[in-house]
């Protein structure tokens, strides 16, 4: 049975127990282009014990792609997941067993992907900046995000070295990611030469120069880099290189093993300065996301 025709009361408990696979399989068709060829990854949260979570990713657990959720997840598989995997393994294909291991039933799971592939030193098809807001109001993060887009768009020197690109903005459930989707892939050295932030020479990179301009004109405690500081906005590009992970659109933003506090959603750039944007994004639930998939489709690359 095609999952798009299978409606349930609670997308995170489609058959009476927590199982996020139904929800992620339902949003998968919208992600085919954005995640084309990208290895998937998941962060599975554990309710007790010394290990709070574990990761599944391609180079350790075998590759999984977004199309696998379209072709191999059906109602039969979802109903089998009331059982232990060991008891039904013989009824599953090898790919379904891998999907099961990435999306373990009865667990809350963050949905990620390899930003520029798993292979270390691979080329860059996209660059993204995490707008980290440690202890800073989310409205300020929104303002900084809008200012970063303006700074990049107005930087002719950057366009000279990067070529054409498209913006994509993602609300992570807690803050924002700003993507530059490059028309022409760049070698791995492009990141180190032009994007990577260093404290010893902060204005060497475009990241540092943009952060400095925003600190001067928008929010004084804005910095570039990976190191998070209480009360500061950090513009962090460090998850851009190949081998690093990024949050998928529509991922739950899991706060602990028993709860999530937001959903990653595509943002209409034209509304990025809107006064109700954050409230509107926070009001979405998994069910209302599925009810409004058509409205999100136009916002995805």
List PLM regions with ranges:
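Short, charged/polar micro-motifs that form catalytic or ligand-binding hotspots
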Residues: 134-142, 196-200
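A short, contiguous, amphipathic alpha-helix enriched in charged residues
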Residues: 138-158
């Amino acid at each position: 049975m095609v999952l798009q025709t299978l409606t349930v009361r609670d997308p995170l408990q489609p058959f009476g127990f927590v199982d996020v696979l139904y929800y992620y399989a339902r949003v998968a068709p919208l992600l085919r282009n954005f995640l084309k060829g990208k290895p998937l990854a998941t962060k599975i949260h554990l309710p007790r014990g010394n290990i709070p979570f574990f990761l599944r990713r391609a180079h350790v657990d075998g590759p999984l792609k977004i199309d696998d959720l379209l072709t191999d997840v059906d109602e039969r598989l979802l109903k089998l997941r009331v059982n232990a995997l060991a008891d039904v393994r013989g009824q599953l294909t090898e790919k379904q067993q891998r999907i099961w291991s990435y999306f373990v039933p009865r667990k809350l799971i963050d949905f990620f992907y390899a930003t520029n592939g798993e292979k270390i030193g691979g080329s860059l098809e996209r660059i993204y900046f995490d707008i980290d807001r440690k202890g800073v109001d989310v409205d300020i993060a929104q303002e900084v995000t809008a200012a970063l887009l303006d700074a990049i768009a107005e930087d002719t020197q950057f366009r000279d070295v990067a070529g054409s690109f498209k913006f994509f903005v993602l609300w992570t459930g807690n803050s924002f990611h700003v993507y530059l989707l490059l028309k022409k892939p760049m070698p791995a050295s492009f990141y180190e030469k032009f994007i990577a932030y260093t404290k010893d020479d902060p204005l060497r990179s475009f990241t540092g120069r943009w952060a400095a301009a925003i600190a001067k004109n928008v929010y004084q405690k804005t910095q570039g880099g990976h190191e998070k500081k209480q009360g500061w906005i950090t513009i962090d590009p460090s998850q851009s290189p190949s081998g690093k992970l990024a949050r998928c659109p529509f991922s739950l933003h899991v706060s602990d093993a028993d709860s999530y506090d937001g959903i990653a959603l595509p943002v209409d750039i034209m509304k990025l300065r809107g006064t109700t944007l954050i409230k509107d994004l926070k009001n979405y639930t998994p069910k209302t996301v599925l009810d409004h998939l058509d409205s999100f489709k136009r916002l995805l690359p």
